[in-house]
Amino acid sequence: MLKMSRNEVLLYALVISAFLSISLFEGFVILTLLLVLYKILKERKIKGSLTPGILLYSLSTVLSTAIFYPKRFLKGIEEGLFQFIYFLNLKKEEVKGFSKIFPKLLLGISLILLPVVFYKFYKYGEPKPIWGGTFEVGFFYALFSITTFLLFFKERRFIYIPLFLLFLAVIFLSARRSMMLAFFVIFYLILFVLFKSKKLGKLAFWSVNFLIILSFIGGYVYLSQKDHRFKTLNDIILGKKELNYQNLNSISSGRLNLLLEGISIIKEDIENKRFINLLIGHGVRAGEYMPHRYGMTQHRYESIFIVSEFIERGILGLLGILYIYFMYFKKVLSFRIKREEDIYTYLLSVPLGLHLIQSVFTFFWDALLPLYLLLFKAFETLQDERKP
């Protein structure tokens, strides 16, 4: 009988529940968090390359919400403290076994979800998974696409090619531009790592590029017929519409308005010398109680993450996020695939990478962020083990 450690059980439970039920997932996050906090209090030490960033982000989130918007304190705990599961003390043996099963687990989940996604697309006109909406399905299938590509690269089984293209089509069906951007950036980052590792020849590189570019053109043509934002962009490119504020705001889904809202809030904080707000922000969902001069009454000032996060978490929270970005790309860009199992190791870093890119025009927090951080911790554990 296969025996698994407690940490392995938690890893599998978190991954599987992330695709089945957000409530179940959060239950496992809370359980993991309690174990982590107990361990921290007992041993009085934490480790991981993202530690400074997570501490700044989490503490500024909890403090600002407790002080300025206590009504949302529990949300502040969720967005801040839940990220502490990154500090779970993973061991090499635990992660090594998990990393080998992780790709096939994702592949199995991707196939199970497909009937659900296509049924909801047929029934409601939008592809959706078991829980969540088009954003989640876009993220899931960006991850699944990259998984099938890496599995093809390792196993050389051609069944992965049609699956890769099918999953790529689902990303375009989601019409989530942030996820399309995230997929292409992380995919080309993978090509870079493979090339620098001398695992990808010129012919293979250009063949993959041809498939991706062809898929992109097909996806763009489809979205240009179905999505008003792409239609507006095409009209501007073709000279049918002017490049003005109204059209830019339409293309950005109202984010231009929200960007101006956010900048005005920061400007007022500076003018009125609200140093605490500048330091730790106004709390999560600050848009629910703060002014909206441009008519956008959303609960968040969702535009470019630098402005969005500055308002909710201040300069400390923003610095924490920027630190996480820096350390992620530093670790990933320096990674080299020397052995076949290194492909499994690399895949553990992909979810956080996809999230970092897609969050540039939204917010850093996501319901599944604790899992992305923990998977990156697993990546670090195996990466550090390779050092002489």
Curated annotation (Swiss-Prot):
Any one Pfam family match given in the protein's UniProt record, by short name: Wzy_C
Its placement in the membrane is given as: Multi-pass membrane protein
InterPro entries, A to Z? O-antigen_ligase-rel_domated
Where is the protein localized?
Cell membrane
Annotated protein name in UniProt: Uncharacterized protein aq_1502
Under the cellular component aspect of Gene Ontology, which terms does the record hold?
Answer: plasma membrane
Q: Does the keyword Kinase apply?
A: no
What UniProt keywords apply to this chain's record, in alphabetical order? Cell membrane, Membrane, Transmembrane, Transmembrane helix
Transmembrane domains' residue ranges = 15-37, 97-119, 129-151, 158-175, 179-196, 203-225, 304-326, 347-369
Q: In its keyword annotation, does this UniProt entry include Transmembrane helix?
A: yes
